[in-house]
Amino acid sequence: MHDITREFVGLASPLVGRAGAGGHPCQGIYHRPEGHRPTTAFIATHYNVDFSEHYLAPYLAERGYGFLGWNTRFRGNEPYFLLDHALAEIGVGVRWLKEVAGVERVVLLGNSGGGSLMAAYQSQAVEPNVLPTAGGRPVDAIQHLDAGDLFVALAAHSGRPEVLTNWMDPSVTDETDALSVDPDLDPFGPRNPAPYDAEFQRRYRAAQRARNERITNWALERLDALRGTRARDQLFQLHRTWADLRMIDPAIEPSDRRPNWCYLGDPARANYGMFGIGTLSTLRTWLSMWSLRTSQCIAAPHLARITVPSLVVHATADACVYDSDADALFRHLAAPDKRLETVKSDHYLQEPDGTRSLAADLIANWVAERTP
Protein backbone atom coordinates (compact mmCIF):
# COMPACT_ATOMS: atom_id res chain seq x y z
CA MET A 1 0.00 0.00 0.00
CA HIS A 2 1.08 3.58 -0.69
CA ASP A 3 1.26 6.63 1.53
CA ILE A 4 -1.13 9.26 0.21
CA THR A 5 -0.55 12.82 -0.95
CA ARG A 6 -3.55 15.13 -0.69
CA GLU A 7 -3.54 18.30 -2.77
CA PHE A 8 -6.14 21.05 -2.48
CA VAL A 9 -7.38 22.20 -5.88
CA GLY A 10 -9.22 25.52 -6.27
CA LEU A 11 -10.16 26.62 -9.77
CA ALA A 12 -12.18 29.24 -11.58
CA SER A 13 -15.62 28.53 -12.98
CA PRO A 14 -16.54 29.47 -16.55
CA LEU A 15 -19.71 30.99 -15.08
CA VAL A 16 -18.91 32.90 -11.88
CA GLY A 17 -15.88 34.57 -10.34
CA ARG A 18 -14.13 33.99 -7.03
CA ALA A 19 -15.97 34.89 -3.87
CA GLY A 20 -15.20 38.21 -2.27
CA ALA A 21 -13.49 36.38 0.57
CA GLY A 22 -11.24 34.65 -1.96
CA GLY A 23 -12.72 31.19 -2.37
CA HIS A 24 -12.79 29.56 -5.78
CA PRO A 25 -16.20 28.32 -6.94
CA CYS A 26 -14.75 24.94 -8.00
CA GLN A 27 -12.85 23.15 -5.24
CA GLY A 28 -11.70 19.69 -4.33
CA ILE A 29 -8.90 17.50 -3.02
CA TYR A 30 -6.74 15.33 -5.25
CA HIS A 31 -5.62 12.11 -3.59
CA ARG A 32 -2.75 10.15 -5.12
CA PRO A 33 0.00 7.74 -4.06
CA GLU A 34 2.93 9.64 -2.60
CA GLY A 35 5.73 10.11 -5.12
CA HIS A 36 3.63 8.81 -7.99
CA ARG A 37 1.67 10.48 -10.81
CA PRO A 38 -1.15 8.10 -11.71
CA THR A 39 -2.18 7.81 -15.34
CA THR A 40 -5.70 6.75 -14.33
CA ALA A 41 -7.79 8.78 -11.90
CA PHE A 42 -11.34 8.93 -10.57
CA ILE A 43 -13.48 12.03 -10.23
CA ALA A 44 -16.57 12.08 -8.00
CA THR A 45 -19.06 14.94 -7.66
CA HIS A 46 -22.51 15.23 -6.04
CA TYR A 47 -25.34 17.68 -6.62
CA ASN A 48 -24.76 19.36 -3.26
CA VAL A 49 -22.81 17.07 -0.91
CA ASP A 50 -19.11 17.85 -0.33
CA PHE A 51 -17.18 15.00 -1.96
CA SER A 52 -13.69 16.50 -1.51
CA GLU A 53 -12.89 13.95 1.22
CA HIS A 54 -14.89 11.09 -0.25
CA TYR A 55 -14.61 7.91 1.77
CA LEU A 56 -13.24 5.87 -1.15
CA ALA A 57 -10.51 8.38 -2.05
CA PRO A 58 -7.79 7.02 0.28
CA TYR A 59 -8.64 3.42 -0.56
CA LEU A 60 -8.31 3.93 -4.29
CA ALA A 61 -5.19 6.09 -3.87
CA GLU A 62 -3.64 3.27 -1.84
CA ARG A 63 -4.30 1.02 -4.83
CA GLY A 64 -2.34 3.28 -7.15
CA TYR A 65 -5.06 5.52 -8.57
CA GLY A 66 -5.66 9.23 -8.43
CA PHE A 67 -8.95 10.41 -6.93
CA LEU A 68 -10.31 13.94 -7.29
CA GLY A 69 -13.13 14.54 -4.84
CA TRP A 70 -14.67 17.48 -6.68
CA ASN A 71 -17.22 20.11 -5.75
CA THR A 72 -19.07 22.57 -7.91
CA ARG A 73 -20.26 25.87 -6.44
CA PHE A 74 -23.47 24.08 -5.43
CA ARG A 75 -21.81 22.11 -2.60
CA GLY A 76 -23.96 22.84 0.44
CA ASN A 77 -25.98 25.11 -1.83
CA GLU A 78 -28.76 22.86 -3.11
CA PRO A 79 -31.52 25.52 -3.30
CA TYR A 80 -29.80 27.20 -6.25
CA PHE A 81 -28.69 24.18 -8.28
CA LEU A 82 -28.75 24.34 -12.09
CA LEU A 83 -27.69 21.25 -14.03
CA ASP A 84 -26.02 22.95 -16.99
CA HIS A 85 -23.92 25.11 -14.66
CA ALA A 86 -22.87 22.08 -12.59
CA LEU A 87 -21.79 20.13 -15.67
CA ALA A 88 -19.59 23.02 -16.78
CA GLU A 89 -17.89 23.02 -13.39
CA ILE A 90 -17.40 19.25 -13.35
CA GLY A 91 -15.71 19.76 -16.70
CA VAL A 92 -13.22 22.07 -14.98
CA GLY A 93 -12.18 19.20 -12.71
CA VAL A 94 -11.90 16.66 -15.52
CA ARG A 95 -9.79 19.08 -17.55
CA TRP A 96 -7.49 19.69 -14.56
CA LEU A 97 -6.89 15.95 -14.22
CA LYS A 98 -5.80 15.71 -17.83
CA GLU A 99 -3.92 18.98 -18.28
CA VAL A 100 -2.31 19.44 -14.86
CA ALA A 101 -2.30 16.12 -13.02
CA GLY A 102 -1.08 14.24 -16.09
CA VAL A 103 -3.91 11.73 -16.13
CA GLU A 104 -4.51 9.81 -19.36
CA ARG A 105 -7.72 8.00 -18.36
CA VAL A 106 -10.58 9.42 -16.27
CA VAL A 107 -13.07 7.24 -14.41
CA LEU A 108 -16.35 8.99 -13.65
CA LEU A 109 -17.58 7.80 -10.23
CA GLY A 110 -21.28 8.42 -9.68
CA ASN A 111 -21.94 7.77 -6.00
CA SER A 112 -25.33 8.14 -4.30
CA GLY A 113 -27.13 11.12 -5.84
CA GLY A 114 -24.01 11.71 -7.91
CA GLY A 115 -24.89 8.68 -10.04
CA SER A 116 -27.33 10.57 -12.23
CA LEU A 117 -25.15 13.71 -12.16
CA MET A 118 -22.06 11.96 -13.50
CA ALA A 119 -24.22 10.10 -16.02
CA ALA A 120 -25.52 13.48 -17.21
CA TYR A 121 -21.94 14.71 -17.53
CA GLN A 122 -20.86 11.81 -19.72
CA SER A 123 -24.07 12.03 -21.73
CA GLN A 124 -23.51 15.72 -22.43
CA ALA A 125 -19.85 15.14 -23.27
CA VAL A 126 -20.58 12.54 -25.94
CA GLU A 127 -23.85 13.93 -27.30
CA PRO A 128 -24.79 17.46 -26.17
CA ASN A 129 -28.41 17.42 -25.03
CA VAL A 130 -28.77 19.47 -21.83
CA LEU A 131 -30.79 22.66 -22.23
CA PRO A 132 -31.02 25.81 -20.08
CA THR A 133 -33.80 25.88 -17.51
CA ALA A 134 -36.85 28.08 -17.98
CA GLY A 135 -35.41 30.93 -20.00
CA GLY A 136 -31.83 30.67 -18.76
CA ARG A 137 -28.93 31.55 -21.04
CA PRO A 138 -27.15 28.72 -22.89
CA VAL A 139 -23.88 27.68 -21.25
CA ASP A 140 -21.20 27.51 -23.93
CA ALA A 141 -18.80 25.61 -21.65
CA ILE A 142 -20.91 22.43 -21.76
CA GLN A 143 -20.68 22.11 -25.52
CA HIS A 144 -17.11 20.77 -25.44
CA LEU A 145 -16.72 18.66 -22.29
CA ASP A 146 -13.99 16.02 -21.98
CA ALA A 147 -15.68 12.62 -21.80
CA GLY A 148 -14.76 10.01 -19.22
CA ASP A 149 -13.09 6.75 -20.23
CA LEU A 150 -14.93 4.51 -17.76
CA PHE A 151 -18.08 4.91 -15.65
CA VAL A 152 -18.82 3.54 -12.17
CA ALA A 153 -22.16 3.88 -10.35
CA LEU A 154 -21.83 3.16 -6.63
CA ALA A 155 -24.91 2.95 -4.37
CA ALA A 156 -26.46 5.28 -6.91
CA HIS A 157 -29.98 6.70 -7.01
CA SER A 158 -31.96 6.71 -10.24
CA GLY A 159 -32.21 10.50 -10.50
CA ARG A 160 -33.26 13.48 -8.43
CA PRO A 161 -36.88 13.75 -9.63
CA GLU A 162 -37.58 10.05 -9.07
CA VAL A 163 -35.90 9.97 -5.68
CA LEU A 164 -37.75 13.00 -4.38
CA THR A 165 -41.07 11.76 -5.75
CA ASN A 166 -40.60 8.27 -4.29
CA TRP A 167 -39.68 9.76 -0.92
CA MET A 168 -42.21 12.60 -0.69
CA ASP A 169 -45.29 12.32 1.50
CA PRO A 170 -48.37 12.61 -0.76
CA SER A 171 -50.71 13.11 2.17
CA VAL A 172 -49.68 16.80 2.32
CA THR A 173 -52.77 18.82 1.40
CA ASP A 174 -51.37 22.35 1.78
CA GLU A 175 -47.79 23.05 0.67
CA THR A 176 -47.61 25.99 3.09
CA ASP A 177 -48.58 23.88 6.12
CA ALA A 178 -46.14 21.18 7.26
CA LEU A 179 -48.86 19.54 9.37
CA SER A 180 -51.60 19.33 6.74
CA VAL A 181 -52.60 15.74 6.05
CA ASP A 182 -55.05 13.60 4.13
CA PRO A 183 -55.62 10.70 6.54
CA ASP A 184 -56.49 8.35 3.69
CA LEU A 185 -52.92 8.72 2.35
CA ASP A 186 -51.02 9.16 5.62
CA PRO A 187 -48.43 6.32 5.73
CA PHE A 188 -47.92 6.83 9.46
CA GLY A 189 -51.60 7.18 10.42
CA PRO A 190 -53.90 4.60 12.02
CA ARG A 191 -55.92 4.11 8.83
CA ASN A 192 -52.92 2.77 6.93
CA PRO A 193 -50.76 0.51 9.07
CA ALA A 194 -47.89 -1.42 7.51
CA PRO A 195 -47.66 -3.84 5.81
CA TYR A 196 -49.33 -1.91 3.00
CA ASP A 197 -51.65 -3.68 0.60
CA ALA A 198 -51.28 -3.41 -3.17
CA GLU A 199 -54.20 -0.99 -3.56
CA PHE A 200 -52.81 1.46 -1.01
CA GLN A 201 -49.40 1.29 -2.66
CA ARG A 202 -50.98 2.06 -6.04
CA ARG A 203 -52.93 5.06 -4.71
CA TYR A 204 -49.92 6.30 -2.77
CA ARG A 205 -47.53 6.19 -5.73
CA ALA A 206 -50.07 7.94 -7.97
CA ALA A 207 -50.56 10.65 -5.34
CA GLN A 208 -46.79 11.16 -5.05
CA ARG A 209 -46.51 11.80 -8.77
CA ALA A 210 -49.54 14.09 -8.62
CA ARG A 211 -47.90 16.15 -5.86
CA ASN A 212 -44.76 16.56 -7.95
CA GLU A 213 -46.86 17.66 -10.94
CA ARG A 214 -48.84 20.19 -8.86
CA ILE A 215 -45.63 21.82 -7.67
CA THR A 216 -44.31 21.94 -11.24
CA ASN A 217 -47.52 23.61 -12.43
CA TRP A 218 -47.26 26.16 -9.63
CA ALA A 219 -43.56 26.85 -10.33
CA LEU A 220 -44.23 27.49 -14.01
CA GLU A 221 -47.16 29.75 -13.17
CA ARG A 222 -45.08 31.72 -10.66
CA LEU A 223 -42.25 32.22 -13.14
CA ASP A 224 -44.75 33.50 -15.65
CA ALA A 225 -46.24 35.84 -13.06
CA LEU A 226 -42.77 37.19 -12.18
CA ARG A 227 -41.95 38.04 -15.78
CA GLY A 228 -41.62 41.79 -16.14
CA THR A 229 -41.33 42.37 -12.38
CA ARG A 230 -38.26 43.15 -10.30
CA ALA A 231 -37.89 39.48 -9.32
CA ARG A 232 -36.55 36.78 -11.66
CA ASP A 233 -37.13 33.91 -9.25
CA GLN A 234 -38.20 33.06 -5.71
CA LEU A 235 -37.49 30.55 -2.97
CA PHE A 236 -40.05 28.13 -1.57
CA GLN A 237 -40.15 25.36 1.01
CA LEU A 238 -41.05 21.70 0.56
CA HIS A 239 -42.27 19.72 3.54
CA ARG A 240 -42.16 16.02 4.40
CA THR A 241 -39.77 14.14 2.13
CA TRP A 242 -39.00 10.95 4.09
CA ALA A 243 -42.03 8.83 3.29
CA ASP A 244 -41.10 6.15 0.77
CA LEU A 245 -43.23 3.15 1.72
CA ARG A 246 -40.14 0.96 1.35
CA MET A 247 -38.51 2.84 4.21
CA ILE A 248 -41.38 1.79 6.47
CA ASP A 249 -42.48 -1.60 5.14
CA PRO A 250 -39.64 -4.12 4.62
CA ALA A 251 -42.01 -6.45 2.76
CA ILE A 252 -41.96 -4.08 -0.23
CA GLU A 253 -38.86 -4.97 -2.26
CA PRO A 254 -37.28 -7.09 0.50
CA SER A 255 -33.53 -6.63 0.96
CA ASP A 256 -30.87 -6.70 3.66
CA ARG A 257 -31.85 -3.19 4.82
CA ARG A 258 -32.88 -2.32 8.36
CA PRO A 259 -36.71 -2.20 8.66
CA ASN A 260 -38.49 1.09 9.36
CA TRP A 261 -35.35 3.12 8.73
CA CYS A 262 -34.06 5.87 6.44
CA TYR A 263 -30.82 7.84 6.20
CA LEU A 264 -31.98 10.07 9.08
CA GLY A 265 -33.28 7.24 11.26
CA ASP A 266 -36.96 6.66 12.04
CA PRO A 267 -38.93 7.72 8.91
CA ALA A 268 -41.89 9.12 10.86
CA ARG A 269 -39.63 11.40 12.87
CA ALA A 270 -37.45 12.34 9.88
CA ASN A 271 -40.51 13.11 7.75
CA TYR A 272 -41.65 15.83 10.13
CA GLY A 273 -38.13 17.10 10.79
CA MET A 274 -36.21 19.99 9.26
CA PHE A 275 -33.69 18.07 7.18
CA GLY A 276 -34.32 16.40 3.85
CA ILE A 277 -33.84 16.63 0.12
CA GLY A 278 -35.49 19.44 -1.78
CA THR A 279 -36.58 21.25 1.36
CA LEU A 280 -35.70 24.64 -0.14
CA SER A 281 -35.56 25.54 -3.83
CA THR A 282 -35.85 28.38 -6.25
CA LEU A 283 -38.48 27.95 -8.93
CA ARG A 284 -35.78 27.29 -11.52
CA THR A 285 -33.97 24.81 -9.28
CA TRP A 286 -37.22 22.87 -8.89
CA LEU A 287 -37.60 22.75 -12.66
CA SER A 288 -33.93 21.86 -13.19
CA MET A 289 -33.51 19.23 -10.47
CA TRP A 290 -36.76 17.97 -8.96
CA SER A 291 -39.60 18.14 -11.48
CA LEU A 292 -40.60 14.85 -13.10
CA ARG A 293 -41.74 16.79 -16.15
CA THR A 294 -38.91 19.24 -16.78
CA SER A 295 -35.79 18.04 -14.96
CA GLN A 296 -32.86 16.65 -16.93
CA CYS A 297 -31.47 15.00 -13.78
CA ILE A 298 -33.15 11.68 -14.57
CA ALA A 299 -30.46 9.04 -15.09
CA ALA A 300 -32.13 6.79 -17.68
CA PRO A 301 -31.81 8.95 -20.83
CA HIS A 302 -28.23 9.82 -19.93
CA LEU A 303 -27.26 6.20 -19.26
CA ALA A 304 -28.57 5.37 -22.73
CA ARG A 305 -25.76 7.52 -24.15
CA ILE A 306 -23.00 5.89 -22.09
CA THR A 307 -21.07 3.31 -24.12
CA VAL A 308 -17.75 3.25 -22.24
CA PRO A 309 -17.08 0.26 -19.93
CA SER A 310 -19.42 0.62 -16.96
CA LEU A 311 -19.69 -0.90 -13.49
CA VAL A 312 -22.71 -0.74 -11.16
CA VAL A 313 -22.04 -1.56 -7.49
CA HIS A 314 -25.13 -1.99 -5.31
CA ALA A 315 -25.17 -2.11 -1.50
CA THR A 316 -27.83 -4.66 -0.59
CA ALA A 317 -28.47 -3.19 2.90
CA ASP A 318 -28.89 0.37 1.60
CA ALA A 319 -31.81 2.00 3.42
CA CYS A 320 -32.96 4.05 0.43
CA VAL A 321 -31.43 2.63 -2.76
CA TYR A 322 -33.22 -0.57 -3.67
CA ASP A 323 -32.51 -3.57 -5.86
CA SER A 324 -34.85 -2.19 -8.52
CA ASP A 325 -32.79 1.02 -8.67
CA ALA A 326 -29.56 -0.86 -9.34
CA ASP A 327 -31.27 -3.13 -11.85
CA ALA A 328 -32.68 -0.12 -13.71
CA LEU A 329 -29.31 1.65 -13.82
CA PHE A 330 -27.70 -1.47 -15.22
CA ARG A 331 -30.49 -2.04 -17.73
CA HIS A 332 -30.41 1.52 -19.08
CA LEU A 333 -26.64 1.61 -19.61
CA ALA A 334 -25.83 1.34 -23.32
CA ALA A 335 -22.31 0.07 -22.68
CA PRO A 336 -21.61 -3.31 -24.33
CA ASP A 337 -19.11 -3.95 -21.52
CA LYS A 338 -21.05 -3.55 -18.27
CA ARG A 339 -21.17 -5.40 -14.97
CA LEU A 340 -23.44 -5.39 -11.91
CA GLU A 341 -21.88 -6.28 -8.56
CA THR A 342 -23.27 -6.29 -5.02
CA VAL A 343 -21.81 -5.78 -1.57
CA LYS A 344 -23.71 -6.60 1.60
CA SER A 345 -23.52 -3.22 3.29
CA ASP A 346 -25.28 0.06 3.98
CA HIS A 347 -25.36 3.15 1.76
CA TYR A 348 -21.99 4.48 2.94
CA LEU A 349 -20.33 1.05 3.18
CA GLN A 350 -19.71 1.58 6.90
CA GLU A 351 -20.80 -1.85 8.13
CA PRO A 352 -19.50 -4.46 8.40
CA ASP A 353 -15.91 -3.36 8.92
CA GLY A 354 -13.79 -3.85 5.84
CA THR A 355 -16.55 -3.22 3.32
CA ARG A 356 -14.95 -0.07 1.95
CA SER A 357 -11.71 -1.94 1.36
CA LEU A 358 -13.65 -4.73 -0.32
CA ALA A 359 -15.47 -2.28 -2.58
CA ALA A 360 -12.22 -0.52 -3.44
CA ASP A 361 -10.68 -3.86 -4.42
CA LEU A 362 -13.69 -4.65 -6.58
CA ILE A 363 -13.59 -1.29 -8.36
CA ALA A 364 -9.79 -1.14 -8.68
CA ASN A 365 -9.59 -4.65 -10.11
CA TRP A 366 -12.36 -3.90 -12.60
CA VAL A 367 -10.56 -0.75 -13.76
CA ALA A 368 -7.21 -2.57 -13.96
CA GLU A 369 -8.74 -5.15 -16.30
CA ARG A 370 -9.69 -2.33 -18.69
CA THR A 371 -6.62 -0.09 -18.57
CA PRO A 372 -2.98 -0.67 -19.56
Question: Where do the language-model regions lie?
Answer:
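N-terminal cap/lid segment of alpha/beta-hydrolase-fold proteins
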Residues: 1-40, 352-353
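Short, surface-exposed "cap/lid" segments of acyl-processing enzymes
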Residues: 32-65, 69-76
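Catalytic nucleophile-loop/oxyanion-hole region of alpha/beta-hydrolase
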Residues: 48, 73-107, 357
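Primarily recognizes the serine-hydrolase "nucleophile elbow" in alpha/beta-hydrolase
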Residues: 96-99, 105-176
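Alpha/beta-hydrolase-fold enzymes
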Residues: 140-263
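Conserved alpha/beta-hydrolase "acid-adjacent" motif
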Residues: 162-163, 319-325
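Short beta-strand/loop motif that positions the catalytic acidic residue
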Residues: 306, 312-314, 318
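Catalytic histidine-centered segment of alpha/beta-hydrolase-like enzymes
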Residues: 345-357
